[in-house]
Structures are given as C-alpha cells and as structure tokens.
C-alpha cells in the first residue's frame, strides 16, 4: 500500500495502480483496501483513464459504501457529473 502512495505522490500513476491492485487482490478485507480503491481510481483519472477511474470509484462505493473513502468517491463522481447507482449495505465497519 505504502509503495503505491509513494508512487502516486511522485506522479508515477501506472506503478501506483499496480501496488493498489495488489492490495485489493491480496487483502480485500484490509482496513487499507477502501483507501487503495479510492487512490487507484484517482490515479486512473489523473492519468487520463477516465472510464477506468469511474469504474473503480463505483467499485469503491459498492464494496465499501459506509467508508469515508466511499464518501470521497461519491463526491468526486458527483463533481464529474457521473451518475451513481445506489449501493447495497456492506460489511465494512470503521
């Protein structure tokens, strides 16, 4: 996760996405997973991968709807004028 954060801050979005994907695949229940999903979507948007970014932010909202990161994802999508479908309740607990 932290290697993804370092790559993201350096503007190395492809590397950041790779590290965030690893967190999501290997540790989907980790407390860092919602942040990894959010950052992955942001990195995709920042690297002009609009559709992938939108998809990942929607996945964030669906997988972790009660997380603070989902609130940020909703805000980002709303700001982009992207419609958000209602999410099902999740098992995410703060």
Language-model features: locations:
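Acidic, polar-rich low-complexity tracts and alpha-helical solenoid repeat scaffolds
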Residues: 1-94
């Amino acid at each position: 996760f932290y290697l993804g954060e370092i790559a993201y801050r350096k503007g190395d979005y492809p590397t950041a996405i790779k590290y965030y994907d690893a967190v999501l695949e290997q540790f989907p229940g980790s407390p860092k997973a919602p942040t990894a999903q959010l950052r992955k979507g942001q990195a995709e948007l920042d690297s002009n991968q609009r559709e992938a970014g939108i998809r990942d932010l929607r996945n964030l909202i669906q997988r972790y709807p009660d997380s603070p990161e989902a609130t940020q994802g909703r805000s980002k999508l709303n700001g982009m004028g992207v419609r958000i479908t209602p999410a099902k309740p999740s098992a995410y607990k703060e």
